[in-house]
């Protein structure tokens, strides 16, 4: 069982709070999938690209004393590789210890960036886009929205998914939706 919701504002501007609207719809579907919630939302394109990635799973934080050092090492490796490729990080946000949002400037091949970054053990890119942001984590919509500040997300459209794992693990990697690697905004 899962739940899916979406919204499109054809004449929306940057003042439409789709994060709050999506959270409300997905929270109403939490009985269809309480394990994890994911959002794919399209905000305003400001000319930069948004890189969302994780350096661990949420469950990893409970299982190992060494994970916190590994998270720091992975994040340092991500930063070093971005610098090596000439990616300029304009803004960094870390809604959780393991999930990160970078606003970047780069005019080269983003597939090369994605491959180089994902080659770091434990690192997974969730999305890259000029307007797409893919956010997913464990818990229902209110939990994920609170963690990531999604009730302040303005944009034009989005789709979301609540998941009850039946055949795979309960983790961020298995949560929906997925980014269409390596395509920007898909």
What are these regions (language model features)?
Residues 1-186:
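N-terminal glutamine amidotransferase
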């Amino acid at each position: 069982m899962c739940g899916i919701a979406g919204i499109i504002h054809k004449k929306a501007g940057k003042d439409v709070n789709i994060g709050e609207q999506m959270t409300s719809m997905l929270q109403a579907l939490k009985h269809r999938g309480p394990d994890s919630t994911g959002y794919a939302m399209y905000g305003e394109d400001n000319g930069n690209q948004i890189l969302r990635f994780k350096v661990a799973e949420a469950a990893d934080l409970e299982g190992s004393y060494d994970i916190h050092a590994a998270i720091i090492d992975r994040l340092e490796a991500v930063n070093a590789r971005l610098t090596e490729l000439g990616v300029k990080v304009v803004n960094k946000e870390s809604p959780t210890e393991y999930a990160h949002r970078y606003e970047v400037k780069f005019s080269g091949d983003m597939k090369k960036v994605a491959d180089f970054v994902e080659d770091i053990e434990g690192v997974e890119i969730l999305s890259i886009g000029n307007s797409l942001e893919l956010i997913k984590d464990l818990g229902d919509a209110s939990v994920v929205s609170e963690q990531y500040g999604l009730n302040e997300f303005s944009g034009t459209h989005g789709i979301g998914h609540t998941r009850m794992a039946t055949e795979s693990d309960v983790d961020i990697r298995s949560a929906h939706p997925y980014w269409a690697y390596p395509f920007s905004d898909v």
